[in-house]
């Protein structure tokens, strides 16, 4: 059984999409991409790879050329601005490989080059991006869409508004959510805006749905929705010099349309309603389930629900309070709570929400008929496991005290004392003592050094503690995603009970836009 709201959306979306092929009005998409870092050291190769991957999707999704303004890092400046992984050592000597691990600095070894993104509009700077939005606003027509993709760095809120997070531009110039919203307010109200954002703290930009980015001003005149990698109060995953790792939200989101991730990992079933097209909301559902990151992705409609609906006995939501008075009102109104069997609650969920719930339950090895209260209980247990694992990893981490007790520095000194010729790493490949059978003998002698056992034991223990912490965090994140989805189901179920017709109408319009398709 589908909710009445979902059935309405399923009827409205095809009608809206047909407007572009009816022969009277052909709506166009206009794309604006903001990518890259704030300096060469903050401009990781994964950001470049994300933009190139998106360009590939655009070229395959539109039958005719589409306007696409791209702002990336330092723009067309030929200087090296991109941080990439240094070439790995190709040594075949186990002795040299071990020495490299002992003497090299922790973390990836990097180098720099100029970015290779074609068709750049300008560098990532506030004035240029504002000009680009003004340019688009000057020639769009009613029914067009503006699609904005951000794969950059972001900053947390600095003032009193926790949602006023920012995009960090070249030279560390910020674009705050409220400033960005003021620019969007200049877009004609009959032009819809779809945002896909993957920067840290990007969830704050969900408030672009309000005029000026401020809930006190009411909703914006135009319909705006967004899909965000992370909440407004947490950093996001994904910025790294290693492009072989594409575990970040937008790679999975855009990969849902192409059938593979940025690195070629195949995508499973995404077309949940089997209409032979992938919608934005279906891509989001896939990313929520498939991306193994610390992110808790959300969309604008999730934030809208929390602004206008509430859950019985729940602190979050419109006019929410744990007071006995409000609890009594909630019961009187018949508002649903976070209780009962999940299988019964899921009947009220949209198709995409059910996909997320089923996928996350499978990952957590939980039954579909589990009680919601038990999910909340297990979530708290996993959160505590993560806190303990993180504390343990911190104790064995990179603090000065731990560095002194790891034995690494002592081992380095003992190696140089016994083999002074090893002081220059560039000479290692030329030393016969490190290759062949002589290399095997060197390894035996190195392992007999007094500091080696301390170094190796500490290295193994740190690695195990870190792996345990990462595993515990990912499990906690899966619970957070599941609970977030369940809450959204209940918020949506309660919305018609307490909201005005205008609020319901706007929510329906949001869902319609979120369920639209990418491309022509």
What residues fall within each predicted segment?
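Boundary/activation segment at the start of structured domains
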Residues: 25-143, 333-520
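Acidic, glycine-anchored loop motifs typical of Ca2+
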Residues: 47, 161-163, 266-280, 303-305, ...
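Solvent-exposed loop/turn segments at secondary-structure junctions
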Residues: 37-41, 74-79, 152-158, 172-174, ...
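Active-site-proximal C-terminal subdomain of hydrolase catalytic domains
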Residues: 52, 194-303
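Bacterial N-terminal signal peptides that target proteins for export
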Residues: 2-13
